[in-house]
Amino acid sequence: MENEESGKSFVVQWNNSEGGLSEGPLSVLWSLIESYKVDIFDVSLSRITRDFLSFLRISETLSLELSAEYALMAANLIYLKSKALLPDPGFEEEDYEPPLPPELVEKLLEHKKFQLTAKKLSEMDQTQTGVFRRESNVTLDEEDNWLDVSLLDLISAFHEILESQSVEAEIPTLLTAPHRFTVEEKMEKILFTLREKKEISFPELFEREKPEKAEIVATFLALLELSKQRILRAKQHKLFGEIRLFLVEGHWNGTEQQSKD
């Protein structure tokens, strides 16, 4: 009974795209860890599994989709716990409490980092809520006369991509997905594409069937890094129109030589 009551304080909620409230299993796990007031590497796998299952028992408002996510996480925790508690002939300590496995710790730390990044982007976006934009009918006639794109425009376009229905749900691979996407690899891919096509639209960076959120974030960070290094420029031919990406003049030969080495 004590566990069920204490479990009510472990609910973590945020606004979803439909305006309602959502809860995620990784956020609940992180909230549990914070309530223990110990280092994440010292958290008992048995304890967090027990408390997570207790949380599920008292949760009555989960949607069908979220229930499936929680059920999968619960199954993963139970599997990891049973695996960790298998008898080890070389280890005889009776009170041994297995810690969280490295793969779960890694996912939790990634999740927290992503949450902090999303919060920062949201705060930056909210600073623009008092600014009313008018759709501009002014198109720049000269082909080479483009408007520079601001960071806030890029962030807005990034949010649209993240909220797209084509983004793949990552729940089935919460604990098993390896690091398949790095910023460095995405930088190379963007440069290769621009060398071939000369210019591309912002959405073209993410044109893969059901891209994962991790891939989208890595691609966006690669875009920002290339822009920071003045290798790439983001422009639009119409105020608040489609964002297009170009290589800065002077980097064509350098990038081509690097690709040949």
Swiss-Prot record:
Give a GO biological-process term.
Answer: DNA replication
Instruction: List UniProt keywords, sorted A-Z.
Output: Cell cycle, Cell division, Chromosome partition, Cytoplasm
One of the record's GO cellular component terms:
cytoplasm
Per its UniProt record, what Pfam families does this chain match?
SMC_ScpA
Q: Does the keyword Cell division apply?
A: yes
Q: What does the UniProt entry say about where the protein is found?
A: Cytoplasm
What's this chain's function? Answer: Participates in chromosomal partition during cell division. May act via the formation of a condensin-like complex containing Smc and ScpB that pull DNA away from mid-cell into both cell halves.
Question: What family classification does the UniProt entry report for this protein?
Answer: Belongs to the ScpA family.
HAMAP family per record: ScpA
Assembly information from the UniProt record: Component of a cohesin-like complex composed of ScpA, ScpB and the Smc homodimer, in which ScpA and ScpB bind to the head domain of Smc. The presence of the three proteins is required for the association of the complex with DNA.
Q: What is this protein called?
A: Segregation and condensation protein A
